[in-house]
Amino acid sequence: EKTQDWTIDLWGYSGTIEEDLARRDFTIDAMALPLSEWEALDSPELFEKVLDPFNGLRDVAQKCIRVVNPHVFQDDPARLLRVVHLAARLHFRMDPETTRLAFQSAPLLSQVSGDRIRNEFLGILSMDGARGYLQVLDHLDLLCRIIPELAPAKGVEQPKEHYWDVWDHSLH
């Protein structure tokens, strides 16, 4: 019998709950359950009780990570790595607009502390299928910003005994 894993995030907020949810990064993190509905956690009516102004439940059902607003990566550039880590952990995909915004915001990664980059990057590396997520980081123009030493390996051919170029060989 599989039990449902829940994360309860208690957080103080100012303004309305809707304003607080609007400050979140991704739709799947921008949902709330009123404390008065606590007992609904184990109820079939749970989804009717959830405050979900950004359609996070739909995105959970579709296994999709979508930004709440187009400024989330400018507001906190560490989210550039968090979105990939979250996708890896949940086995979700990023929606095309989120992907476009992440790629466009990649230069902002230089504003993130080394500790935060290290923590998110190591989290990504610890996931099953990490190679695929390294390719996602590369597609988003983030991987060589984290490890600039990898950039010269792109397109470098190897002797015929090798199937991949140096870059792809490094990822495998």
Specify the residue positions occupied by each region the protein language model found.
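Catalytic cores of the polymerase beta-like nucleotidyltransferase superfamily
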Residues: E1-H172
